[in-house]
Amino acid sequence: MSTTTRIKAKDAIDAFIADYISPTSVIESDTTEIIVTAITDFNDPQFRDYLMGLPVTFPLDTVRKCLAILSAFVPDGKQRAIYSVLAQFAWEAGDDTLAETYLTLALNEDAGYSLANLLKRVFATGWERESFVTMRIQLHPKVIEALDDTVIGS
């Protein structure tokens, strides 16, 4: 059983991105293991929502690159959450083709995945891309506040 908590996963993803940005840091393998455990557990939307808010703290392009790297470590059949987040970020960055690719991957894995279906509607209706930025800025502090020592997967 996993002993990764929401707050431990938050700290791990923050450290991973900071290490990715730093020219002198070495990314620790236990950091990626914690993150992959958290992402793999699709039953914990709290951590997924934290991932969606990362561009409040880090540049969007950096977050996209880091999550794309991490997605390669997530087991097949467990990638719908990270693909959905990557779809949102690609769409925000104006890369509609990549956004649709990630969205298709998420929906192919789980046609009923709520975030992927929400994004499908958002993309189809032509929402302003800035809408997600505004929502993220408003919601991310609340998401962080709700992160706790709940074991992911329990």
Give the label of every model feature segment:
Residues 1-154:
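Charged, compositionally biased boundary regions
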